[in-house]
């Protein structure tokens, strides 16, 4: 029989691996640019920037995400029913009760963030509270608590911040390269062949790095959603509640105003809507590999089908 939070240790390792890969990638890009530009200052800047970014991401990434989402902390008196649902599920799951935030937005959605279960946050939109019944809301909260129990909230939040850093640095280095190469052409008639190769490599890296960063972000997001769906259903012992909630959230035509591309993968369902219910399975099959790779969430009908195929009676 499946048990809760079997992905916890794996996600701890993935978090440290992510930080290590990020750190080494920035140093590699910085080294290539330093060689191409004949300036060691670029490498020093890359090292310092990656260390500071990793530190900030670990300790304050949740606050950054909450600020970006316009989420506001609420007290027990402001929504007693929501607090009781969260507290009851936390007791069942053996988790500390997270802080609860509300996003004033009519689009139904939710996410969890924080560096560990002791510093976790669950954020839900006002639209979610208005449009779901109790069993559906319990399913959504159980899904978010499963992200907390599996300790993948830090992984997901770090990805949000670090992908933004990679994109920012890549753009900065690319602009620096064009400026520096133009200035060197003015000072000399030519450079070494190796330096020219490194310059081309630097430009290619600055273009490809953000693409690979986004692909990694989306891949992590899709995998963690399936795991949280399964664990959420185990927690409530009622997969149909979460399945119905996902159908309602997906079919709702309103986009989430506070969402952006950096935080989209954190939500239980993509916050960007096209004013249509979730696409058919046939429609998803017609999508190309790259289109599917760029999806922040698994196809909704696959998630719903997986939930309705679960047996949690034992």
Report residues per predicted region.
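Polar-ligand-bearing catalytic/cofactor-coordination segments
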Residues: 1-23, 36, 42-44, 48-198, ...
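Membrane-embedded alpha-helical segments in integral membrane proteins
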Residues: 25-34
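Hydrophobic alpha-helical transmembrane segments of integral membrane proteins
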Residues: 160, 203-207
